[in-house]
Amino acid sequence: MSNKMWGGRFSERPDEIMEEINVSIDVDRHLYAQDIAASKAHAAMLATQGIITASDAKNIGKGLDTILSEIGKGGFTFKRALEDIHMNVESRLSELIGPAAGRLHTARSRNDQVATDFRLYVRDVIDETDAALAAFQQALVARALEHAGTVMPGFTHLQTAQPVTFGHHLLAYVEMAARDRGRFQDARKRLNESPLGAAALAGTSFPIDRHATAKALLFDRPMANSLDAVSDRDFVLETLSAASICAVHMSRFAEEIVIWTSPLVGLIRLSDKFTTGSSIMPQKRNPDAAELVRAKTGRVIGALNGLLIVMKGLPLAYQKDMQEDKQGAMEGFAALSLAIRAMTGMVRDLAPDEAKMKAAAGEGYATATDLADWLVRTLKMPFREAHHVTGRIVAKAAEGGVALHELPLKEMQAIEPRITKDVLGVLSVESSVKSRTSFGGTAPKNVASQAKSWAKRLEKERKLG
């Protein structure tokens, strides 16, 4: 027997392999809440337009509420023979209310139905991700305020470059998360149009009101072209793109945590809450949470690439290939959610070794730029000349195995006679960070001000909901 939902044209049942490759309920069951919400909006609109009776619409709504409760409580049996979430819900609705259930699919196709469901799902993902990123920012800002003046090495090429503060470093990720949130919100704006009512691809001859269903589902408007409505997956791609960039940020931070917690570096320590041990080496404390964030974020990027490859060769309109749009995306979104929450936990948990940070900040002649700047300001030396002179002084200090501030003044003067003892005032890591007062710089006052500004902004967002 062929599938009773679409089998009027068929006289043979599908091959077992056909059933196996065609089924999607294992994945799209996660759309049940969105599917039921869209069906309720559709049924109400059909009744308002006089396409079905108010009595049928009422019974459909009650039946759908029952199904929603059954699934939520784990009492619903999903049947693989019914292929997908749409047919599973409709079949159960038929059991509950009888023939009236068959009227629900009037002026609707599974093509616009799944497009609507998935838009609602991705919209929910965006809202949840925004909330998670806000919590991540709040954790970063709190630690940045705490460590606005904690000196640490700033790096380029993973080499000590210039002293910065730990708070300044943390605020860099606040800015990244802000851009991530902006990208998700931009994607949400373009996503928030309703495909419902586009039917299979050409619209419908029934006098439906697509604006009413769009409003009921909190979309801004219905999509203007029925072909585009059922074949578009830009909303998933764009959200996965934003998710991938966000994942890169999480991975970069996770990598830093892995490096900083290494005993060879030892700038920070994670508590037992975010580390694991070894089955053979009793002494080990491994930063597995950070390492797993680094790995899981790759799944987000993989989901984006996978869907791009699925979509790149599809003519209009709906193709069955699009059934493969959900699993990778859902797994990618879940991986990002876990990564953000794990990073938030680690930010709250990590303990910087302030003494070690300060000592490391001065290694590698990190205040050499401060010396060059002093030569420019005090001796009116062109920067390129100052750069050259400083390089010679650094070489002299390295030759003697001493730090810049330990190099005798007379040896500096042997290279540049006009240097005075005042230069020693700019060669400490504390004076270096305090001098970086330009907007966006690492001076502790700047960092504290920026952190307070972010704290106010995030609190305002929280109150506005």
From Swiss-Prot:
MF terms in GO: argininosuccinate lyase activity
Pathway: Amino-acid biosynthesis; L-arginine biosynthesis; L-arginine from L-ornithine and carbamoyl phosphate: step 3/3
Protein location: Cytoplasm
Keywords tagged on the record: Amino-acid biosynthesis, Arginine biosynthesis, Cytoplasm, Lyase
Catalytic activity: 2-(N(omega)-L-arginino)succinate = fumarate + L-arginine
InterPro entries assigned to the protein according to its UniProt record, in alphabetical order: Arg_succ_lyase_C (IPR029419), Argininosuccinate_lyase (IPR009049), Fumarase/histidase_N (IPR024083), Fumarate_lyase_CS (IPR020557), Fumarate_lyase_fam (IPR000362), Fumarate_lyase_N (IPR022761), L-Aspartase-like (IPR008948)
A Pfam family per the record: ASL_C2
RNA-binding among keywords: no
Entry-linked PROSITE patterns: FUMARATE_LYASES (PS00163)
GO biological process: arginine biosynthetic process via ornithine; L-arginine biosynthetic process
CDD domains the UniProt entry points to: Argininosuccinate_lyase (cd01359)
Enzyme superclass (EC): lyase
GO cellular component: cytosol
HAMAP family: Arg_succ_lyase
Protein name (record): Argininosuccinate lyase
